[in-house]
Amino acid sequence: MDWRVGEITAFSAAYNKAIECLARGPKSTKDLTRWLHQREHAREDVEATIERLTERGLLNDAQYAEIFARTRATTRGMSRRRIAAELAKRGVARELADAAIAEVMSDENIDERAIVEAAAAKKFRSFAKLDADVQRRRLYGFLARKGFAPDLVRETVQRLTRP
């Protein structure tokens, strides 16, 4: 690419802003691109910045997906489906997301059944004074919104709401 002084300055501004953004935490390529566009950097400068960061290993969607999946699965008790949906929203390729989720689930010995049981038991306590049908309906909705598989949700709700 043939650079002029003004173009180098504009590129440097975009690059420096991207570095500042990444210093606060990892980002996906799509998130960082969107963030730079919101700060009104030229498309060419954003593309060159993304390319340079990727070449230098500072922007890596596979690494981002693993970090994201690990924090969501271990600290927030999210399901595989919910993590995959969140990563897709952030522009991470499905293959990268699936690989990262599988790696995290096996590395951390995470059992999705245990996650759903813990989340359901915790939430169920807040429904103690409600009618049994209302308890079932609310618990099912809560677990479904967390992204757990319908069969697993149904089984867990039945087990917890059994008289």
Language-model segments: which ranges?
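An alpha-helical, amphipathic repeat domain used for nucleic-acid recognition
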Residues: 1-163
